[in-house]
From Swiss-Prot:
The keyword Disulfide bond applies. Keywords: Disulfide bond, Glycoprotein, Hemostasis impairing toxin, Hydrolase, Protease, Secreted, Serine protease, Signal, Toxin, Zymogen. GO terms for molecular function: serine-type endopeptidase activity; toxin activity. Disulfide bonds join 31-163, 50-66, 98-256, 142-210, 174-189, 200-225. Residues 1-18 form the signal peptide. This is Snake venom serine proteinase 5. PANTHER family: KALLIKREIN-1 (PTHR24271:SF47), KALLIKREIN-RELATED (PTHR24271). Residues 25-249 form the Peptidase S1 domain.
């Protein structure tokens, strides 16, 4: 069954007012406390439900399907139970979506830009990850991370973020398992062909970091997570660089690429 990394929990959200679901890293290990300084936890009154990436002191990039009412963002978080001294919490001041996104089409232009209600300060556990200077190459080793489920079928959410390395694959690899994706979708295909490592429920909106650059946003994949020949699909950040930079510069009428 194919699910947007957030849709796995969507029914739960509707029934329990939790939040839209994302995915967690299956087949990974606990992240080093200092290796996810740009990772943002997006949460509501009950739980973490998505992640995002801090790209400067005032802006966060995540998936459009992570939008919800009354959410907050935590930066500098590692353990949900044992807070770091430098953790900072922010509210969204403004949220931006592609104005040319097809209405009610969750598969189209899955990216959201959030302006924080006040800037954050760099610290031991907080630092932005800049936008990519060039697109990634097939074969690149990419890093995934998040508080998503660490088991492929049942939702098992960890107290700390998990990390794993996967490979950037040719886009054609993701077409057979996901024929519903638009032919012109600006996405990346990444995973392990034999399966076992993948983002999963509650990882949605988090980063795909290839060769140290923020290249993708957790978007779409299969459920159960981590299946062979069913890699994850990630929104391609590089293709949205101009739109992001235009919004930050104050051109709120900017449109995304088709």
């Amino acid at each position: 069954m194919v699910l947007i990394r957030v849709l796995a929990n969507l029914l739960i959200l509707q029934l329990s007012y939790a939040q839209k679901s994302s995915e967690l890293v299956v087949g990974g290990d606990e992240c080093n406390i200092n290796e996810h300084r740009s990772l943002v936890a997006i949460f509501n009154s009950t739980e973490f439900f998505c992640s995002g990436t801090l790209i400067n002191q005032e802006w966060v990039v995540t998936a459009a399907h992570c939008d919800s009412t009354n959410f907050k963002m935590k930066l500098g978080v590692h353990s949900k139970k044992v807070p770091n001294e430098d953790e900072q919490t922010r509210n969204p001041k403004e949220k931006f979506f592609c104005p040319n996104k097809k209405k009610d089409d969750v598969l189209d232009k899955d990216i959201m830009l959030i302006k924080l209600d006040s800037p954050v300060s760099n610290s031991e556990h907080i630092a932005p990850l800049s936008l990519p200077s060039s697109p990634p190459s097939v074969g690149s080793v990419c890093h995934i991370m998040g508080w998503g489920s660490i088991t492929p079928i049942e939702k098992t959410l960890p107290d700390v973020p998990y990390c794993a390395n996967i490979n950037l694959l040719d886009d054609a690899v993701c077409r057979p398992p996901y024929p519903e994706l638009p032919a012109t979708s600006r996405t990346l295909c990444a995973g392990i062909l034999e399966g076992g490592k993948d983002t999963c429920v509650v990882d949605s909106g988090g980063p795909l970091i290839c060769n140290g650059q923020f290249q993708g946003i957790v978007f779409y994949g299969a459920h159960p997570c981590g299946q062979a020949l069913k890699p994850g699909v990630y929104t391609k950040v590089f293709d949205y660089n101009d739109w992001i930079q235009s919004i930050i510069a104050g051109n709120t009428a900017a449109t995304c690429p088709p």
